[in-house]
């Protein structure tokens, strides 16, 4: 984007990923508060503001959690000495761990009884570049979310790491009750995890609504797909919903030619009001959007999206996407490296804490140095 913005014909429409991205580009962003696009939003929760100026508008809302195979889990529930009799009983970390531990210890028994080819309770927690973001960013959101919630804040220059013991116990569960030896995680990919789940080799798979396209048309039918919140053992998590937010905000370059700006505003309006545009976003791309114009028949039929709707209707509190406040990509990489070293047995958890807490302060200060 830096090189594009430096050109004589710089883009009129661009996107940022959240508050940190906006901080780098806010001097280019037109105030969209008077736009038709803004008037179609269902809530101000889906904008990025600088003061009262609306500088970014989210165009896709995504959700992630622990995707699960309903059929396998329901079959497990019928077994003698199963630790639950219904999936609905999984509403905290202790129960999730008890179920995963039991499934992991009874893989052969489950496979023999039901004809499955289960290799583990959870898919591999691959830490190569195609998969590590699930843990250094999306999973790391949970301890940040609960710390922010306790303090009543939405960002910080210095994270304390209050919930890093919780982060450790969910990470331990992922790498222990798994299809894969932890020593092999550095070479495991996002495609490996998607394939393991899609072929019925694992019951649980941390990912989001976007993963539907990787799963569908395989062994797992749409009606077999469910999603659980990522429980980490925080107080009150029985009322927790899925992690919902956006990393995709449209911004309009206020320095562009006025005719280009108007054409861009007209285009965005067309995307969210025309049949062609709405069909492309809702059906071809499978997006959930934050616009009122999609409420008349342009809602995604992605079963993972529908799972989120069920939590919302049940009054569960969605977990906000606070990872957009992570200080830098370097910070994420530091946490990811420490997680991998810990999983492989070549590093300890203290190194994860150091990367998380000290690394945050270092990277935040570097980004905000005058």
What are these regions (language model features)?
Residues 51-59, 64, 94-155, 202:
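Extracytoplasmic/periplasmic solute-binding protein
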Residues 80-87, 157-159, 174-188, 201, ...:
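A local structural motif
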Residues 90-95, 184-199:
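Short helix-initiation/N-cap motifs at beta->coil->alpha
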Residues 100-101, 146, 150-187:
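Glycine-centered hinge/linker elements that transmit conformational signals in sensory
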Residues 15-74, 112-117, 134, 224-231:
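Hinge/lid segment of periplasmic solute-binding proteins
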């Amino acid at each position: 984007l830096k090189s594009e913005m430096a050109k004589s014909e710089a883009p009129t429409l661009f996107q940022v990923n959240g508050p940190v991205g906006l901080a780098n580009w806010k001097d280019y962003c037109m105030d969209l508060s008077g736009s038709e696009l803004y008037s179609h939003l269902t809530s101000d929760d889906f904008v990025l503001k600088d003061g009262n100026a609306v500088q970014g508008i989210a165009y896709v809302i995504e959700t992630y959690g622990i995707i699960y195979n309903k059929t396998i889990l329901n079959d497990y529930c019928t077994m003698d000495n199963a630790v639950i009799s219904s999936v609905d009983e999984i509403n905290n970390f202790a129960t999730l761990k008890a179920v995963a531990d039991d499934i992991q210890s009874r893989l052969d028994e489950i496979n023999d009884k039901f004809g499955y080819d289960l290799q583990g309770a959870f898919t591999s927690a691959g830490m190569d570049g195609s998969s590590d973001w699930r843990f250094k960013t999306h999973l790391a959101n949970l301890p940040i979310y609960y710390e922010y919630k306790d303090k009543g804040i939405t960002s910080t220059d210095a994270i304390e790491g209050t919930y890093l013991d919780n982060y450790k116990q969910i990470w331990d569960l992922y790498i222990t009750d798994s299809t894969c030896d932890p020593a092999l995680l550095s070479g495991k990919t996002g495609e490996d995890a998607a394939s393991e789940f899609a072929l019925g080799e694992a019951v649980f798979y941390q990912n989001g609504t976007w993963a539907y396209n990787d799963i569908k048309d395989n062994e797992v039918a749409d009606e077999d797909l469910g999603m659980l919140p990522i429980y980490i053992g925080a107080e009150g998590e029985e009322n927790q919903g899925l992690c919902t937010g956006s990393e995709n905000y449209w911004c309009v370059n206020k320095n562009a030619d006025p005719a280009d700006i108007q054409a861009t505003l007209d285009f965005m309006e067309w995307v969210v009001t025309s049949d062609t545009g709405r069909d492309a976003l809702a059906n071809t791309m499978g997006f959930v959007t934050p616009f009122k114009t999609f409420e008349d028949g342009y809602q995604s039929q992605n079963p993972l999206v529908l799972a989120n709707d069920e939590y919302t209707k049940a009054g569960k509190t969605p977990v906000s996407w606070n990872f957009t406040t992570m200080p830098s990509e370097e910070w994420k990489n530091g946490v990811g490296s420490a997680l991998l070293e810990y999983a492989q047995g070549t590093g300890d958890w203290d190194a994860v804490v150091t990367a998380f807490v000290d690394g945050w302060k270092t990277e935040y200060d570097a980004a905000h140095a005058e």
